[in-house]
Every structure is written in C-alpha cells, then in structure tokens.
From Swiss-Prot:
GO terms for biological process: chlorophyll biosynthetic process; protoporphyrinogen IX biosynthetic process. Belongs to the class-III pyridoxal-phosphate-dependent aminotransferase family. HemL subfamily. Residues 1-34 form a transit peptide. The gene is GSA. This is Glutamate-1-semialdehyde 2,1-aminomutase, chloroplastic. Transmembrane segments: none annotated. HAMAP family: HemL_aminotrans_3. Keywords: Chlorophyll biosynthesis, Chloroplast, Isomerase, Plastid, Porphyrin biosynthesis, Pyridoxal phosphate, Transit peptide. SUPFAM superfamilies: PLP-dependent transferases. Disulfide bonds: none annotated. The keyword Isomerase applies.
Length: 469
C-alpha cells in the first residue's frame, strides 16, 4: 500500500479496497433473462440488435473500431442515436449517463451549443480546402501557448497519425532506429507500436497483430510501466541506439494507471543522458489533466508531444509538436516527409478552438476533479459495502477502477482484475442507464456537463448492480 500512499501524496487519488467475500443469493430471473437489466422494468435494445446484426454483414465485426463490439464484456453492443451534455440516447430510446465521452474528446459535454453554432458558421464556408486556412494559426497558437514542450505543431487527423509522425520524426532527428515503449501503453495501430500494446489489443487478448512483419518491431523495446530500473537496464544494453522513449504519462489504455512519483523524472534523466528523446503521448491526457496536459500537471517537459481527442472537439484530429529544432525536420521545412489531405481542415480547427476556449475558463479543472473524485469514491465505497475487492483512482477528469485488490502499477497488475466480473458489472450498469467503457482495460472520463445528480444516480446504480453480481 506504500505506492498508493505515495500516489495520494502527489495529488493522485488511489484507493485500494479489500473486503471479505460474502454469500450471495441466486441471480433473479429478470437478470438471467435480460443480461443487462436488474429489475423488471422495460429495457430493450431490440433496435440496436437489429442494426448491429445488419452491420456485421457490412463491416468486419459490425464496427469500425474493435472495442465497440463488446467482445470483452459480452451483451448486445448499443447503437446510439444522439448525445447532449453528459447523456446519450440509443436507437431504442434508452437514456444513459455517459462516462466514455467519445473516448475522451467530450470534455465540455456532448453537442455543446457554442461549439455547434461555430461549426455551423464554418460549414457555410466549406468543409475542407486542401490548402491553408487562418483557423490553423489560431488553434496552433493556442496549443503552443498551453503545452510546455510544444514550440511548433503539425496537425493531422487522428492520434494514430500523430504517433506515426512522431515516430518517424524522432528517428529522423536522432539518426537512431530503436524506440522504447511500455507494456500496455497504446500509441495507435502503427506496426512499430503493436508490441505488448493496450486498448483494443489488450481487450482481444492479442500480444500483437497478424500482418505486422518482424522487421517492423525488431527495433521496439518494451519495459513494464513504472519500472525505472528496467528502463535504465535497456539503455545500458542499447547505449546510443535508442531514438526515443514513448509513453502515456498516465496510462489509459490498460485501465487507469498513474505514474509513481519518481518515474517520469527518471525517464527524463535517462533520455537526456543518452541523447534520446522523451515523447509524451498525450492524445488522452492532453488538456484533460490540466490545460497544459500531464506535463503541466506533473511538471515534466518532454521533447515531443502527441495530441488528439480534445483538440478536435469531437471531430477527427491529431497533432504532434515539440522543440523548434526538432519540428523543423518536418517537410517542407526539413527532409522528414509527412502529409495529409484533410489535415488542418476548418471544421476540426473550429471545434478545437471553441473547446479550448471553454477549458480556459476559471475553475474548469477544479470542477472536473470534484465530480470525478465523488464518482470514484462513491463506487469504491459501495464496492466495499457490498463485499467486492476493488481499487481505483482519478486525476481531474480521468478515472478508472479494477476488480482487484491493487494497487495497480503496471499492465501485469491490471491483468489480475476480474474481467468476467467487470463484464457483469458493465451489463448491469447499462440496464440502470449508465454507459461505461466496454472494457476493463480502458480509462473513463467525466466532463464539465456532469452534475452531482449524475454522480449520485451512478453510485446508486453501482450499489444495486454490485449487490447483484
């Protein structure tokens, strides 16, 4: 428990909860029948089922991103029709409190009126120019002003693209080929990163992916997250050969796993000593833990940063940036080639600008911390009350919990979680009108639109479901 105490001391809420096992009554007939509903109330996902079955004939697995298929939690994938604020409605008319937030972008709430109004005005002028637009300058300046490591930025269309660009950049700048990443960290689906990856790869139980040639990953070294000694050993064994260390400063794609107090400092020191670069993948944490991202929150400045999600306000976007001398390697300023047809399109720039404007308002991150803390404390408390071994934590608007005693410091710890129990919990919460990420190995997100009432309803639902499972 010393690790948990240290995490709390550094401003991170980690609460392992152990409770004795208790006997439970047999499941009710309604639960067995509905698989997602605890009560005899009307809860149907018939239209979702019909649409999803049709989708499976049209798209691989019926989805365009694997985790949406509910493979790891079971039950019927939900087809959504509309969103607003902190709530979502499916095609059957069911309403849910949302803690996925489109996997992170919806930090100010879904379908924000001001963002939508700005998008309508931009839309009147066109959706994409394939040429420079003034809005790129505005968002670029906002990003550069906010993120400590970024002196120049390149916009792309996804977090995966951002990490692909950053990977090529660090190799071009250093003249080295090897990279070091951490087990369970996900940096998109580029070949070089699909080694002991998290996110959907973890959900499917695949250590990597067929179709990735050995040559693509021969230069990818891996270490356990939060293990500075393992990193130092890899640098000793590969002296002068590692181009960069890539990491999620707070892991979100193996569940929510914060760094130990000295870990990020150790990475900064070892990379500087060896002439390697430090890359923070802030696609998830950027503008969520603080306006300047995890690097502002922890006070550690990397050399290169990747961004996505929030900076597009819900539209497809990504970015990578860093020191000016590094970024000037990127074409057309330098020889490292990277391009994109829709990069910097006016719609994504508009949504990003107006989302960041909202995040600049006083009290934003204090509010996120308040509601998220209430949520996590509430769920862990009812977990203990109902006899479940659970642990979890949060930083500002990012959170997670595991059905394990904890503490969870790395991917191996995360894999000790009872994923079958999480699946039952997830299905039960759907029946109670709460939408959580359909995988134990994904972080959750709150927004400025979440209310105390949302949190109270969620905790009440969690207690009900936990008593069932």
């Amino acid at each position: 428990m010393a690790g948990a105490a240290a995490a709390v001391a550094s401003g991170i809420s980690i609460r392992p909860v152990a409770a004795p096992k208790i006997s439970r009554a047999p499941r009710s007939r309604s639960v067995v029948r509905a698989a997602v509903s605890i009560d005899e109330k009307a809860y149907t996902v018939q239209k979702s089922e019909e649409i999803f079955n049709a989708a499976k004939e049209l798209m691989p697995g019926g989805v365009n991103s694997p985790v949406r298929a509910f493979k790891s939690v079971g039950g019927q994938p939900i087809v959504f029709d509309s969103v607003k604020g902190s709530h979502m409605w499916d095609v059957d008319g069911n309403e849910y409190i949302d803690y996925v937030g489109s996997w992170g972008p919806a930090i100010i709430g879904h379908a924000d009126d001001k963002v939508n109004a700005a998008l309508i005005e931009t839309l009147k002028k066109g959706t994409s120019f394939g040429a420079p637009c003034a809005l790129e300058n505005v968002l670029a300046q906002m990003v550069i002003s906010a993120v400590p490591s970024i002196e120049m930025v390149r916009f792309v269309n996804s977090g995966t693209e951002a990490c692909m660009g950053a990977l090529r950049l660090v190799r071009a700048f250093t003249g080295r080929e090897k990279i070091l990443k951490f087990e369970g960290c996900y940096h998109g689906h580029a070949d070089s990163f699909l080694v002991k990856a998290g996110s959907g790869v973890a959900t499917l139980g695949l250590p990597d992916s067929p179709g990735v040639p050995k040559g693509a990953t021969v230069g990818t070294l891996t270490a356990p997250y939060n293990d500075a000694d393992a990193v130092k050993k890899l640098f000793e064994d590969n002296k002068g050969e590692i181009a960069a260390v890539f990491l999620e400063p707070v892991v979100g794609n193996a569940g929510f796993i914060p760094p130990q107090p000295a870990f990020l400092n150790a990475l900064r020191e070892v990379t500087k000593q060896d002439g390697a670069l430090l890359v923070f993948d802030e696609v998830m944490t950027g503008f969520r833990l603080a306006y300047g991202g995890a690097q502002e929150y922890f006070g550690i400045t990397p050399d290169v940063t990747t961004l996505g999600k929030i900076i597009g306000g819900g539209l497809p976007v990504g970015a990578y940036g860093g020191r000016k001398d590094i970024m000037e390697m990127v074409a057309p300023a330098g020889p490292m080639y990277q391009a994109g047809t829709l990069s910097g399109n006016p719609l994504a720039m508009t949504a990003g600008i107006h989302t960041l404007k909202r995040l600049m308002e006083p009290g934003t991150y204090e509010y996120l911390d308040k509601v998220t803390g209430e949520l996590v404390r509430g769920i862990l408390d009812v977990g203990a009350k109902t006899g479940h071994e659970m642990c979890g934590g949060h930083i500002r608007g990012m959170f997670g919990f595991f059905f394990a005693g904890g503490p969870v410091h790395n991917f191996d710890d995360a894999k000790k979680s009872d994923t079958a129990k999480f699946g039952r919990f997830h299905r039960g919460m759907l029946g109670e009108g709460v939408y959580l990420a359909p995988s134990q190995f994904e972080a959750g997100f709150t927004s400025l639109a979440h209310t105390t009432q949302d949190i109270e309803k969620t905790v009440e639902a969690a207690e009900k479901v936990l008593r069932w499972i």
